[in-house]
């Protein structure tokens, strides 16, 4: 059995029995306010209630961790396996499915290329640091100090989930939230990564250290290379700074150690999402 088939089987075991054939999509009505029932108008946390893109919507339904209010398809899409799977998953979970003409669909979608699928769901749970540490695995937390580009944040979350990061810590201010662009770029990673937020990252680093987490900041000016770290067993947090500015002074001062990814070319630094991917996989390899 493939990994994908096993995940589908697990999803079905959690879902209510589906004794009917897949229902036909409903045609949208002008009076239906799509997404208005979502808590996004009152949610002050990390959001994530608007999901666009085929893989992101598929993972939302497959994870089954939060209520999905509706799935909306652009009318006239060519058939594909992933679209069929989204319809099947929606039917299994009794999620309403609608089809929309191009003009109305474009008025609801917010990303540049939603791939003909939009879904509205309950916002992501805004967790606490203690929640990130309550894991059966060795805690490996990614701390992001002010990422402002949604595509960068989405790419970082995708790489982090693939590398086995057990939780992510974000600041409540001066950082992008989990927008539709973040969710789409993350390709469903937000459904599997516990995400917490704090009022300030320096405070978050201090709280992690109080709870026995070793904190490593990533900075191009560090003396120690990331390949020299000994990170086998202890709970660990990897701290990355914002695009352009890097780690803030207070965040840097509160980390136990500052490390760098060595650069061998002429350009002095990597994109933050690329640096995050390299660092996460390097640490993950050392902790296996």
Please give the residue ranges for each predicted region.
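Short, hinge-like loop/turn segments at secondary-structure boundaries
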Residues: 114-118, 184-189, 232-236
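Active-site/ligand-binding-proximal alpha/beta "capping" segment
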Residues: 216-271
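General small-molecule cofactor/ligand-binding pocket signal
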Residues: 96-100, 196, 259
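N-terminal positively charged helical leader segments and presequences
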Residues: 1-131
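RNA substrate-binding interface of SAM-dependent RNA methyltransferases
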Residues: 73, 81-83, 95, 134-223
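Short glycine-enriched loops at secondary-structure junctions
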Residues: 103, 123-125, 171-175, 244
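Structured adenosyl-cofactor binding patch, chiefly the S-adenosyl-L-methionine
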Residues: 63, 162, 184-188, 249-288
